[in-house]
Swiss-Prot record:
Name of this protein: Uncharacterized protein AF_2331
Domain of life, per lineage: Archaea
Classification lineage: Archaea, Methanobacteriati, Methanobacteriota, Archaeoglobi, Archaeoglobales
Pfam families in alphabetical order: AF2331-like
Gene3D superfamilies, sorted: AF2331-like
InterPro entries in UniProt: AF2331-like_dom, AF2331-like_sf
Amino acid sequence: MPAYVFSKESFLKFLEGHLEDDVVVVVSSDVTDFCKKLSESMVGEKEYCFAEFAFPADIFDADEDEIDEMMKYAIVFVEKEKLSEAGRNAIR
């Protein structure tokens, strides 16, 4: 489960690289569930934050498998002071 920590400038470049002319962005602020738990990863067992988001299904003309493939990133806007040392060191 890779996670990236971007500076503002790097995040804008990241967005530009993913936003082709016909791409729109769906944003939901409806977090329906959240928990922290240990999970296996490529680097061993690590604590992760799990969040469940909800958005209206009627905005898509796609089946569940197609929508699942569309879900690529979760984005958290956070002030630098709320990052741990590891988070600050990971800023690109």
